[in-house]
Amino acid sequence: DMPGALGQGTNTLIDQQDGIPRHQISVRNFQESEVNIKVDGKVDEDIWQQVEQYDNMLVAVPGTGAPAEYKTEYRLIATEKGLYVSGIMYQPPETLVKRRTARDQSIDVDNFGITLDVSGEGLVGYWFYVQLGDSVMDGKVLPERNYKIDWDGPWVGKSFVRSDGWSGEMFLPWSMMNVPSVKGPRNIGFAASRTVSNTAERYQWPGYSYSSARFVTALNQMKVEGVEPKQQVSVIPFASVTSDQALEDD
């Protein structure tokens, strides 16, 4: 009986906004030295099968709140160095929309992503998207939906085309975000998302519509232990970021 076999993953209901639920989950912590994930978008390392998969996405654009048509397997792994995020996006391969764009150029393309409120206080979120074709987007979002693209962090994200859809992976170093020091477990706010360009839909968990009163202050929560925030790294030019650099301490 596999965890998340229903596609839901183990979660606790926090509350609802406009009838849309938000949840708390627990994210497993590993030592960076035992993870050995190559960020290539394939999601083929054994360790991904050791953690729960989640699929609680609803249609947020247009704001119907309906269950997503296509299945998404969303997984999270925390280490002392950062957060690994993977998505397997099931859909008929002929419906995939793949274009390569410059960083932070938002066009009509399939993507998956995450928004993180690392302080858990609802003051600022960092958002990260990997597009099919490996373009990436990132920035900050202030309450409730004030998006800024003038922040670029040293992280890595990749996509991969499968016979049953596509998949993606990202590694997000804690050191590029303003992570407060906390004794013991911490709550990090998060929203998971996916764009299906072919149907002009955006899936999200929590699946609030864009007209909802709250977003940054009403994210899901992930309970994480073992996070070791380092001095924030100075932002390095994106062209020079490699997996190794993203994993470096300093």
Task: Please state what every model-predicted region is.
Residues 1-250:
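Structural preference for beta-rich elements and adjacent junctions enriched in aromatics
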